[in-house]
């Protein structure tokens, strides 16, 4: 659970590193999609249990919820591609990702247009 009410609440979100799961990494590597990627580019993860992961290559999370915070950073970044200013909103996401973020944006646009017709 993450709440962002003020700019200072974004500090942890902005410090969250990107990540990739080991199976996705190996597939992308085999396809030649990781040119320029180094061990410092982000976190390499291996699923352990349903909601647990192991961080590989002797790295540690900067803080307990770093993976969750990176997902929030992805959401804010994806929505910011479409608008300069985000409205106050309460957004709940389970298993989010870039496709889900685009769906949220479409719903936000529909809502704004219904409330404030041109």
Segments (PLM) and residue ranges:
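Short acidic-hydrophobic catalytic motif
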Residues: 1-118
């Amino acid at each position: 659970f993450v709440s962002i009410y003020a700019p200072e609440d974004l500090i942890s979100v902005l410090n969250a590193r990107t990540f990739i799961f080991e199976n996705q990494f190996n597939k992308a590597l085999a396809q030649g999609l990781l040119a320029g990627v180094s061990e410092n580019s982000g976190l390499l993860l291996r699923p352990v249990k349903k909601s647990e992961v192991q961080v590989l290559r002797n790295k540690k999370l900067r803080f307990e919820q770093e993976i969750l915070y990176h997902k929030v950073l992805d959401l804010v970044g994806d929505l910011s591609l479409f608008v300069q200013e985000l409205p106050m909103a309460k957004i709940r996401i389970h298993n989010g990702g870039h496709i889900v973020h685009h769906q949220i944006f479409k719903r936000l646009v529909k809502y704004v247009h219904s409330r404030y017709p041109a």
